A protein has these predicted regions:
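Non-catalytic interaction regions
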Residues: 1-499
């Protein structure tokens, strides 16, 4: 007979063997369900039918506006200690008004229509290469784009821009800027022939002709080159060169006035200032364009800067009202200002799709090179004099004292450097030493189908999530900050000793 419990109901007593067998069987069933294969179609259908959980943290829409430069932000991106609930403040764009630059110029209707065409955006890098006045020197890995995932622009090694002479050497075909001025009767055929070894499906001669006419009419660099080439046709004319100035005025996005970007120089060019670009009439030797030159970007990306708007220069300054003198505008501040949507402002740069990806990679290499140049020029500030150098030498096991002092010291502040990685490794071990081993190892993955990203991209035609990596990064950063707050302040997993 089954005994009765305290409530009077009969209860069954389980043996230890039965309890162990039951729990073991349930574990086996759970493991078998976890190991059950999931097909791609089944996973995709489950993702489409899935709706956000009631506890899903939605960052809202990007509707907040910076009071200084009209940049668009999410409310969660505000600077908390200087913001109010009804008046958020931001500084990722213009550093609270200290970075002041005019808005981009409105492009011609022809270019605006092309940037709304999905077919054009798919091949925008090819079209830009056709009209680029400098060559893009880098090892671009195109084999990773096999059609099974989003488009990725990946470069190995250094990036450099090269510019040649105004006229091509004898028995050679024109390339890059030479196509604007040499053999103009066959310009369209020359540009298409330049990409004869690539897949030309979708390259439209009509689009090439339209872009050529537009750039010749509005781009100041093209005007300088065309005026110089007219002197080439004069028999017995004096030798000359083209000088592209480095000392630009402190302004951006203004339409370059004639004569402000460069000039034709006759005879000696010894008075050229540092980093000026000197182009000779017929000289087959290509020269490397310095990243410090304001023409570095507009010469390479004429479709993003159709008027020839100049880029960053060391002569640019921030506007600090309470400072005795203006501080220099860093490369990082300049490009951070550029890649923000602004209320009521049309930006070709942000609608560039795959070309925008290439521009971001190019801009990041400029930022990293600027940091490396600063470190190289201030080695004495980063070394703890002789003691640090000796300690590093002993740590490496060097016995030859002649090698001490000949290496470049990369401090821990340089992102990705050996000391940077070692410092973070030591910080992680220090936390474990004080608080013990971690109880949770949590991974946090970004989903490009998050509602915030999808809603923002729906405002712009023909763009995919991979075309705006800046938006993906910003939304992911907000989610990470909110998740950490969810763990630490809400104590979801209990009291947090370290995180």
């Amino acid at each position: 007979m089954i005994p009765r419990g305290a409530s009077g109901k009969r209860r069954r007593e389980f043996s230890t063997y039965e309890i162990g067998e039951s729990s073991h069987s349930s574990r086996l069933r759970r493991v078998s369900r976890m190991l059950e294969p999931v097909t791609c179609a089944r996973y995709a259908s489950s993702q489409e039918e899935r709706t956000p959980l009631p506890t899903y943290f939605d960052c809202g829409d990007c509707v907040c506006v910076c009071q200084y430069c009209s940049a668009m932000f999410w409310f969660a991106e505000r600077v908390v200690h200087i913001s109010r609930s009804n008046h958020p403040r931001y500084n990722q764009c213009c550093k609270s008004g200290t970075v002041a630059m005019p808005f981009p110029l409105q492009p011609p209707p022809v270019i605006k229509q092309l940037f709304d065409d999905s077919g054009f955006l798919e091949r925008i890098r090819l079209y830009n290469s056709m009209f680029a006045m400098t060559s893009f020197g880098a090892d671009v890995e195109e084999n990773i784009n096999d059609g099974r995932g989003p488009y990725v622009f990946k470069v190995s090694g250094q990036i450099s821009h090269w510019i040649g002479s105004l006229c091509p050497p004898p028995n050679e075909k024109p390339r890059f800027l030479q196509m604007y001025v040499y053999d103009t009767q066959n310009e369209i055929a020359n540009r298409l022939r330049f990409f004869a070894g690539t897949d030309q499906n979708g390259l439209s001669p009509a689009i090439v002709s339209s872009l050529s006419d537009t750039l010749k009419s509005i781009n100041e660099y093209v005007r300088v080159f065309k005026n110089a080439f007219e002197l080439c046709d004069i028999e017995g004319g004096p030798d000359f060169s083209i000088r592209l100035y480095n000392n630009v005025p402190d302004r951006r996005y203004d339409a370059p006035a004639p004569g402000t970007l460069g000039a034709i120089v006759h005879g000696d060019d010894s008075n050229a200032s540092t980093y000026d670009i000197i182009l000779h009439k017929k000289n087959g030797t290509a020269q490397r364009v310095s990243k410090l030159h304001p023409s570095y970007m507009p010469l390479q990306y004429p479709l993003l800067f159709p008027f020839g708007e100049q880029g960053w220069s060391p002569r640019l300054h921030r506007r600090l009202p309470n400072a005795s003198r203006d501080k220099n505008l860093t490369v990082n501040m300049y490009y951070s200002y550029q890649i923000h949507d602004r209320a009521g402002v049309y930006s070709l740069l942000l609608k560039g799709g795959r070309l925008f990806q290439q521009y971001l990679v190019d801009a990041y290499t400029c930022i990293e090179q600027s940091r490396l140049d600063y470190i190289n020029a201030n080695q004495n500030l980063f070394r703890s004099e002789y003691v640090a150098g000796m300690y590093d030498a002993l740590s490496r096991g060097d016995t030859d004292s002649r090698s001490i002092g000949k290496r470049i010291f990369l401090p821990s502040s340089f992102t990705g450097g050996p000391r940077y990685m070692y410092k973070h490794y030591q910080d992680a071990l220090a936390i474990c030493r004080v608080h013990g081993n971690p109880q949770y190892f949590i991974t946090f993955t970004c989903n490009v189908k998050w509602p915030e990203i999808a809603r923002h991209l729906n405002k712009v035609n023909c763009l995919h999530a991979e075309d705006r990596p800046d938006i993906i990064s910003r939304v992911f950063q907000m989610k990470v900050i909110e998740f950490v707050k969810f763990m630490k302040e809400d104590k979801t997993f209990g009291d947090v000793a370290a995180c």
